[in-house]
Amino acid sequence: MDVCLSSAQQPGRRGEGLSSPGGWLEAEKKGAPQKDSTGGVLEESNKIEPSLHSLQKFVPTDYASYTQEHYRFAGKEIVIQESIESYGAVVWPGAMALCQYLEEHAEELNFQDAKILEIGAGPGLVSIVASILGAQVTATDLPDVLGNLQYNLLKNTLQCTAHLPEVKELVWGEDLDKNFPKSAFYYDYVLASDVVYHHYFLDKLLTTMVYLSQPGTVLLWANKFRFSTDYEFLDKFKQVFDTTLLAEYPESSVKLFKGILKWD
């Protein structure tokens, strides 16, 4: 089995508690040589280390408990640290569906060196899969989610992906021009999963989706449809994006859409 994990901490049983994300990141940044499964020092560690030192360290939320859950996509075993204490620390059905689609359509999507931003990345599964497929990924979410997100990204991509994912704060609809100026940031794909549910920020979410979409940008959005407000959002989405239903997953009530921003 091909496992894409840092040797700093090997995966344990499903549901086994893990150490603090911040503590693991600090240990990685001290420069201890990385070893392969035979105990040999990896030659690539010197190339990765400068990137680690340049990372912004996000302080993890101190949830009472974490569990680790095992997934397999793109030929890799992926271990995600999750907590049921936060919506943003759990892998939801839309993320699973989107990962499945990315895996099954990898050749068509051609993520190799593509610039990708994920909205509402949560614990990071979708961003990890996109990174494994070769993309340059920026994973975004609210501040309290970023510590665990960064932990999972580094844990599953360090030394086994072409590009180390970046983590950035993104509050929907706020400071977009300042934090993501169009002159400096262009994305081939914008990814989102289960970002639409019963909350009060749907208009700001749509504003953010529109802002991040430039000519040539493809938005892939997977969502479990639970409430009437989900369909109301979809109607608004279709007004500003040329929308294609790419896949449906009846067992989980997830629909996956492709959106291209309308420019006329």
Swiss-Prot record:
UniProt binding sites for S-adenosyl-L-methionine: W92, G120, A121, G122, D141, W172, S193
Record's GO cellular component terms: cytoplasm; nucleus; protein-containing complex
EC annotation from Swiss-Prot or TrEMBL: 2.1.1.-
The reaction(s) this protein catalyses: L-lysyl-[protein] + S-adenosyl-L-methionine = N(6)-methyl-L-lysyl-[protein] + S-adenosyl-L-homocysteine + H(+); N(6)-methyl-L-lysyl-[protein] + S-adenosyl-L-methionine = N(6),N(6)-dimethyl-L-lysyl-[protein] + S-adenosyl-L-homocysteine + H(+); N(6),N(6)-dimethyl-L-lysyl-[protein] + S-adenosyl-L-methionine = N(6),N(6),N(6)-trimethyl-L-lysyl-[protein] + S-adenosyl-L-homocysteine + H(+)
InterPro entries for this protein: Methyltransf_16, SAM-dependent_MTases_sf
Keywords noted in UniProt: Cytoplasm, Methyltransferase, Nucleus, S-adenosyl-L-methionine, Transferase
Disulfide bonds: none
Region described as Disordered: spans on this chain: 1-46
Annotated GO MF terms: heat shock protein binding; protein methyltransferase activity; protein-lysine N-methyltransferase activity
Intracellular or extracellular location(s): Nucleus; Cytoplasm
Alphabetized Gene3D superfamilies for the sequence: Vaccinia Virus protein VP39
Composition-biased stretches (Polar residues): 1-10
Effect annotated for changing W92A: Abolishes methyltransferase activity
Family recorded in the similarity comment: Belongs to the methyltransferase superfamily. METTL21 family.
Protein task: Protein-lysine N-methyltransferase using S-adenosyl-L-methionine as methyl donor. Mono-di and trimethylates 'Lys-943' of AARS1.
Subunit details: Interacts with members of the heat shock protein 70 families; these proteins may possibly be methylation substrates for the enzyme.
Protein name: Protein-lysine methyltransferase METTL21C
Organism: Homo sapiens
